[in-house]
UniProtKB/Swiss-Prot annotation:
It catalyses: RNA(n+1) + phosphate = RNA(n) + a ribonucleoside 5'-diphosphate. GO terms for biological process: carotene biosynthetic process; cellular response to phosphate starvation; chlorophyll biosynthetic process; chloroplast RNA processing; mRNA catabolic process; mRNA processing; negative regulation of isopentenyl diphosphate biosynthetic process, methylerythritol 4-phosphate pathway; RNA catabolic process. The lineage of its organism: Eukaryota, Viridiplantae, Streptophyta, Embryophyta, Tracheophyta. Its EC number is 2.7.7.8. This is Polyribonucleotide nucleotidyltransferase 1, chloroplastic. Residues 692-752 form the KH domain. Its main location: plastid.
Length: 922
């Protein structure tokens, strides 16, 4: 099966390290530098740059590889100071305006560093590379960190340490926006760790820094030594008043119906992410076209800047596996690998492919093609592979040795096998597997699980799995399964967002996506959410946000928790489908149902006998995502799109390809929505009995503070007394009460009604409790927290020496409001509710003789008839009887000392508190 090992020392293309970088050879296959000429004796003459340390068997060689023009320090000048690049400042187009790009002023020791200014928003970006390449893998060692400094807006962090903490979610999302368009432009085989740091140094609140940060990173990479293929740039497109605006301001985006971010090169689109209000596919393509034109203009300017001021690229650092290794792997595993890729079950297929990979590695190792132990990145001791040399020995070709020259020993040439590292074998095996998978799709029109290109996996969904959850759904599509759970709460459950503006922002709806390692049958880390989890959760959240009711129609904070139980591709879109059904199961009145689908693409290249046309795949699996050329997620209903995200793994795509993918995705969404309608058991469409109850009341805005109290004492006492969960009060007078049962909700309502009502003369209050006594009368609670004075003369129709002669604390009586003074103090009367006959009879009684003082005093304790009539005249009669209708009249707040028991009126009228002028206090 295997051909004989080659006599060649190495098979890879000779590699040269870049300017001003000294490297050490660490691989047996790494070539020596040979001079262009050979000695007359036919031996290879070593270049003077190849330094041999030690000789003979068991010795090892260390070769310092430096460019010939690096013998003199290029970074030094005559005075010993470092020679840094000159300060460069240019303007380049950025949508409908220009941005200022500066380099050479800051971060001069980095591979490249730029500051990009838009208005008064400034983003600084630096690029640095490791001197030593990391171990080869199928993942580019690119690390992006984006941070918004509080000092950019003249603020300081509110934390104890007064410095920026861990990366916030929206910063993670911008990190992903920077990372995703850069990766496709990086060449395979480049393993030097690359770090991109991007900081917002100044923010004017008008020009958003996200698209600016992506463009800044594209400029920095173009100027650096990173061997990227093309420069990239990013823009944001909004739809305002029916017109597409490139890079709109923050205020303009508040009115936009579209939030589209696009990044690419001067010829192709690399990344798209956006959210809209059921935007038709045709308008979405128009927006992409507008954004692509803006990106193209920016990228052309960046390319010109890079050619003039950029550093030489590290093309010589690219290390690819030897071409012969592909041939060996195909010979050993081609047929078996093709059969393994046709296994429908993901786990069974993965185990079969893994077993075959180990088999190939074992065979190559036994044949002597694989190095047993490779410590990539360390200096390796190795015998000289060409020959053993001593200082007193001269090596001459065999047949030219004189018998008398005993000190000269001919050394025959031995064939040296071609050696591969274990990492190279695994990389090549994976690439061969990917090509075979793509070949099956292109040539046979069938995918690994037997589906056609536009076929969607079987779908099953169930609602109401979790009895105590407010809403739950298990959504299954093929081997991808998501458990979506909805929790309802009040504003205190809202997610607080810390931003540069410093304004308190709360998210009423948020989706949290979790991808545990068990979902793919692996053992892994469990901890804080990864960048991938944050990104996928945000995409699903924005897809569902459009269908939610307004806060006025549904005053709940909504949390959706999507846990991926099983994954084989498109788990974020499964979260959209499961989340939509879970919202309906929780009783959230959504506007419509939405679904999500992930689209893929495989090029029908000449390698497979094709013409280079794209093949669009619907509902891709994990293997198709990893081996394909595109991952395009689209969510929406039958008519429009709510969220979309596209990542390209090749040089980019055109608008025609995107249009084809959108049309196919629309058909797929309709099919998924039809399957979701078959959910069994279906969503309940009503609130769970375990969901909290929320009552909304309106009070006068001026009375909100009195309900809250000093330091929140009053509202806390209301919560404690009534037993509700929470009370939220807004500046406009809206009061939201949340409770788990109706009884506590009614108690809180009664308390707030009492505190917020405005009493009017003539109002009658039944069953009121006497709270305390004084020599001059009794204090009666007419509503929770509201008391009035019933003077001793108004407690009874008969004369009383003291209030205790008629009542005691705790007794309940009916009273009538007869006066409200200028301080808001209430004067009540029991006597005013007594029948007229008792009052008249009592007024005709004679006073005791000889007690003139008592007579005068008692006269003062009676209500003056004319005064009572004037009070009664202020009230309007109801047509059906003699009860008075409540007047909506504000009373200003009054305070008094504890000695005279002054009452306070701290709130406004509650229209539901009184009926026909009466309020029953239970």
């Amino acid at each position: 099966m295997l051909t004989s090992p080659s006599n060649a020392l190495h098979s890879s293309t000779p590699q040269f390290w870049p300017l001003r970088r000294s490297k050490l050879c660490r691989s047996r296959n790494f070539p020596r530098f040979h001079s262009g000429e050979r000695s007359s004796g036919g031996g290879g003459k070593l270049c003077s740059l190849s330094l041999l340390s030690g000789s003979g068997a068991g010795k090892f060689s260390v070769r310092a590889l430096v460019r010939p023009d690096d013998t003199d320090d290029a970074d030094s000048v005559g005075d010993g100071s470092l020679a840094f690049p000159n300060h460069v400042s240019v303007k380049i187009p950025f949508g409908n305006r220009e941005i200022l790009v500066e380099t050479g002023l800051m971060g001069r020791q980095a591979s490249s560093a730029v500051t990009v200014t838009d208005g008064e928003t400034i983003v600084y970006t630096s690029v640095c590379l490791a001197d030593v390449p990391s171990e080869p893998s199928d993942f580019l060692p690119l690390y992006v960190h984006y941070q918004e400094r509080f000092s950019a807006v003249g603020r300081t962090s509110g934390g104890f340490f007064k410095r920026e903490g861990r990366t916030k979610d929206h910063e993670v999302l911008i990190c992903r926006l920077i990372d995703r368009p850069l990766r496709p432009t990086m060449p395979k085989g480049f393993y030097n760790e690359t770090q991109i740091l991007s900081w917002v140094l100044s923010y004017d609140g008008l020009h958003a820094p996200d698209a600016l940060a992506v463009t800044s990173a594209g400029i920095a990479v173009a100027l650096s030594e990173v061997p990227n293929a093309k420069a990239i740039a990013g823009v944001r497109v909004g739809l305002i008043g029916g017109e597409f605006i490139v890079n709109p301001t923050v205020k303009e985006m508040e009115e936009s119906q579209l939030d589209l971010f696009l990044a690419g090169t001067d010829t192709a689109i690399l990344t798209i992410e956006g959210y809209s209000n059921f935007l038709p596919e045709e308008m979405l393509l128009q927006a992409v076209k507008v954004g692509q034109d803006a990106v193209q203009a920016t990228c052309i300017a960046i390319e010109v800047l890079a050619k003039k001021y950029g550093k030489p690229k590290m093309l010589d650092a690219i290390r690819l596996p030897p071409p012969e290794l592909y041939k060996h792997v195909k010979e050993l595993a081609g047929e078996e690998l093709t059969k393994a890729l046709q296994i429908k079950s993901k786990i069974s297929r993965r185990k079969a492919i893994s077993s075959l990979e180990e088999k190939v590695l074992t065979i190559l190792t036994e044949k002597g093609y694989v190095i047993d132990e490779v410590a990539f990145g360390t200096i390796e001791a190795q015998p000289d592979l060409l020959e053993d040399e001593d200082e007193d020995e001269e090596v001459v070709p065999e047949g030219e040795v004189d018998q008398g020259d005993v000190h000269i020993r001919p050394i025959p040439r031995k064939p040296i096998p071609l050696l591969f590292s274990e990492v190279d074998v695994k990389l090549v095996f994976k690439e061969v597997s990917s090509k075979l998978l793509r070949r099956r799709i292109v040539e046979g029109g069938k995918r690994s699980d037997g589906r056609t290109l536009d076929e969607i996996r079987p779908i099953n969904s169930r609602c109401g799995l979790l009895p105590r959850a407010h809403g739950s759904t298990l959504f299954t599509r093929g081997e991808t399964q998501a458990l979506a759970v909805v929790t309802l709460g009040d504003k205190q459950m809202a997610q607080r967002i810390d931003n540069l503006e410093g304004s308190d922002e709360y998210k009423r709806f948020y989706l949290q996506y979790t991808f545990p390692p068990s979902s793919v049958g692996e053992v892994g880390r469990i901890g804080a959410p990864s960048r991938r989890e944050i990104g996928h959760g945000t995409l699903a959240e924005r897809a569902l946000e459009t269908i939610l009711p307004s806060d006025d129609d549904f005053p709940y904070t909504i949390r959706v928790e999507s846990t991926v139980i099983e994954s084989n591709g498109s788990s974020s879109m499964a979260s959209v489908c499961g989340g939509c059904l879970a919202l309906q199961d929780a009783g959230v009145p959504v506007k419509c149902s939405v679904a999500g689908i992930a689209m893929g693409m495989v090029w029908d290249t000449e390698e497979f006998g094709g013409d280079g046309s794209p093949l669009i795949l619907s509902d891709i699996t994990g293997a198709e995502d990893a081996s394909g050329d595109m991952d395009f997620k689209v969510a929406g209903n039958e008519d429009g799109v709510t969220a979309f995200q596209m990542d390209i793994k090749v040089g980019g795509i055109t608008l025609e390809i995107m249009e084809k993918a959108l049309i196919q995705a629309k058909a797929g969404r309709r099919h998924i929505l039809a399957e979701m309608a078959k959910c069994s058991p279906p969503p309940t469409l009503s609130l769970s009995k375990y969901a909290p109850l929320i009552l909304i009341m309106k009070v006068h805005p001026s009375k909100v503070y009195s309900l809250i109290g000093s330091g929140g004492k009053k509202v806390k006492s209301i919560i404690e007394e009534s037993g509700v969960e929470a009370i939220d009060m807004q500046d406009d007078g809206t009061v939201k009460i949340m409770a788990i049962d109706v009884a506590s909700l009614e108690r809180a309502k009664a308390i707030i009604s009492g505190l917020t009502m405005v009493p009017s003369v003539g109002d009658i209050y039944r069953n009121c409790e006497i709270k305390s006594m004084a020599p001059y009368g009794a204090f009666v609670e007419i509503a929770p927290g509201r008391e009035g004075l019933c003077h001793i003369s108004e407690l009874s129709a008969e004369w009383l020496a003291k209030p205790e002669d008629a009542y005691k604390v705790g007794d309940r009586i009916d009273v009538k409001l007869i006066e409200v003074n200028e301080k808001g103090q209430l004067r009540l009367s029991v006597r005013a509710l007594l029948p007229e006959s008792e009052t008249d009879k009592d007024s005709q009684k004679q006073q005791p003789a000889g007690d003139s003082t008592k007579d005068k005093s008692s006269q003062r304790k009676y209500v003056n008839t004319s005064s009572k009539d004037r009070a009664a005249a202020g009230a309007s009669k109801v047509s059906s009887g003699d009860e008075l209708v409540l007047k909506k009249k504000d009373v200003r707040r009054a305070t008094g000392g504890s000695s005279d028991k002054t009452m306070n009126s701290n709130s406004s009228t509650n229209e539901e508190s009184l009926v026909n002028g009466e309020a029953t206090i239970s």
